[in-house]
């Protein structure tokens, strides 16, 4: 199968709306070209869920990356789902293998992996995450696996945050207490059972958890706020404090209100460009693994090729 897939033209896409700003095509085309694969990666902008579902149902691709707002639809289209996608309730990668369509979510791994590259340690850290969608849940899970002592899930509506967190914790507990403990994919990270037992999971709203936001070692915006001009930050940016780390999953949309507030407060800030590259590396590795291809490049080598292609200084 490796030779069939590796040596024949394949179609790969990023699916979402909007996607015109996406750096994915230039990154993936660069790395697949470097690997010598005759694969073509392009944009698939579907304005409605009906269009997105029809595209996924046609399966005219080897792999698809999925961005806002179609991660739940991608999960539903899959015939097999990795734990990362199940727990996030959304997939950001679909890979075809025969009649199967396999779902993964590398958003959390990408976010944590990039921040660790910048020197941030999740071990014992308190993390506040804005949002309750698949990206936020994927990051919440990855932060727990990476060693966070406390993870706070935030929303405008406290009950919405409660519901999302309760559902995640219930599902995480089921997986963590499976017959075989799921080990971490990265050296130094925790197994599912250890992360489940040793992480304190909390929920709140932007108005009821103000002290917790200020006390957090790292505050992450995992909402779409900032993708449109004039979008506010998720919370009152006066809650930022000097010395905090702040991370915004949004990139390539100018300076967001979240970013401006974090910088003004003296936080160490990074946008989603580095996360995009790190989760893209994980995507390449997943596609190669499912396709039975031995990828001869290391994580760092793939990261460098893709970051340079996108013009990211990360």
Residue ranges and their predicted role:
Residues 145-150, 264-268:
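Conserved S-adenosyl-L-methionine
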Residues 2-120, 253:
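Phosphate/diphosphate ligand-binding glycine-rich loop within oxidoreductases
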Residues 16, 103-108, 123-148, 155-158:
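Glycine-rich adenosine-cofactor-binding loop
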Residues 148-172, 178-193:
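NAD(P)-binding Rossmann-fold cofactor-contacting core
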Residues 179-270:
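Rossmann-like adenosine-cofactor binding region
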Residues 5-6, 122-123, 145, 235-244:
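Short, conserved loop/helix-junction motifs that constitute active-site signature segments
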Residues 245, 249-314:
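Adenosine-phosphate binding glycine-rich loop
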Residues 11, 40, 126, 149-150, ...:
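Residues at the starts of beta-strands that form the adenosine-phosphate
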